Amino acid sequence: MSELTEKKIGRELIYDGAVLRVVKDEVELPNGKSSVREFCMHIGAVAVIPVLPDGRVLMERQYRYPHGRVFFEIPAGKLDFSGEDPLSAAKRELREETGGVAKSYTFLGELDTTPAITDEKIRMYLAEDITFCDRELDEDEFINLEFVPLSELYRMVMAGEIKDAKTQIAVLKVWQIREKYRNM
């Protein structure tokens, strides 16, 4: 198998915003030639799939400006600062967006969202044993909440009705976990 690693030669900062940075790196390719890689640097994010004892999942409907439409997705958000504990961020996002406070969190894995254009990683958690209180949405957040049976979400993912990748993966992982225990 041939070597695939590219070596960074230099970096130019193109844009430095509140949520992401855009950089242009000059790299040395495995064959010794050079090329340019442009990508977004992201602080990282978390996603939480909150599942109630009866199998319903608390979902969000939220307008996503880059796509110009409302998405149906699980609660999620970016880390507030570099080095923030992802589980703490997941707890914060669940509380702020849904008013949910869970006693149990299970790490479901890490997702590299779009590796060709960003280094963003989303750490995903299953939240269970949840109590609810008032939400604490940011002033620029507008989110509608909806409880949906996990079986219906699974059907929606398989039918292509849920377009959000983190939600698809979280639903499939939780479905697989539940199926494993059902068949024991």
Regions found by a protein language model. Give the residues of each.
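Conserved Nudix-box catalytic region and its N-terminal flanking loop in Nudix hydrolases
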Residues: 3-5, 47-92
